[in-house]
Amino acid sequence: MKALSKLKAEEGIWMTDVPEPEVGHNDLLIKIRKTAICGTDVHIYNWDEWSQKTIPVPMVVGHEYVGEVVGIGQEVKGFNIGDRVSGEGHITCGHCRNCRGGRTHLCRNTTGVGVNRPGCFAEYLVIPAFNAFKIPDNISDDLASIFDPFGNAVHTALSFDLVGEDVLVSGAGPIGVMAAAVAKHVGARHVVITDVNEYRLELARKMGVTRAVNVAKESLTDVMAELGMTEGFDVGLEMSGAPPAFRTMLDTMNHGGRIAMLGIPPADMSIDWTKVIFKGLFIKGIYGREMFETWYKMAALIQSGLDLSPIITHRFSIDDFQKGFDAMRSGQSGKVILSWD
């Protein structure tokens, strides 16, 4: 079958031919319809330090997808041939304390689809049936293919009660923009997003944020004054991994504020911890999606009217995958969809 693989320990992704995966007793075989390119896939393409330490070569990459069930393991119940599914990209062990306690998103033995095991940038994918999620009929293939990153946004945004709160989102990448849209949709008062990439800030404006602030041109404190905010932000969603953005967030949080961190900062990032202590801030790390509460919330948000369509900016045939990666690497894109049909 056709697949996009990391074949060499150097920059690039290559189209290749690999054997179709075998279906285990507890697995589903999924015929891929559409996939989306993640920032992780770009890291793998660039062959950065993280990729060199993490990715075995060769490896079929990709973990954002929608497809159709075409094979079912003999022990699997609850799925039928023809079901349209996406799936959780974190494969968990099922036997550690967190897994047994219903906190599978915190499994210490997690392996990643397209990172530690073959991914979805292929004509067929095998995953445990436990990880598959049926897509409601009124959700499009395009939207279903971005459920994985949308789940990161939902998990981060819904970590805290947002109704009536003032929310700061730092980082207007696709996940940050979707998190801001979720916050606005569920009843936050002011949702302010910051970045220095004007293209992506414009995407955030299309998604309905209160203010999209280019911090290279505009002061966040001036924007807060313009909005009549006198006590700081109640909730911070840190999506950038950029130390200056996180320091600004700490400066502008209200006392007792709550921060959810999805962005991955440098290991040696320094902050003024007195602001965390004396403001009584609560900081929560976010990894992946809650299984599977986040997935049900994702579907419900879209079915209740949340419009994510502006975040999908580019669509290509899989044969034009290089154009898709070029768009992602340019920084002038939202989500990029690759069609396998």
Curated annotation (Swiss-Prot):
It is found in: Cytoplasm. SMART domains: PKS_ER. Zn(2+) 2 binds at residues 93, 96, 99, 107. Keywords: Cytoplasm, Metal-binding, NAD, Oxidoreductase, Zinc. Pfam families: ADH_N, ADH_zinc_N. InterPro entries: ADH-like_C, ADH-like_N, ADH_Zn_CS, GroES-like_sf, L-Threonine_3-DHase, NAD(P)-bd_dom_sf, PKS_ER, Zn_alcohol_dh. This is L-threonine 3-dehydrogenase.
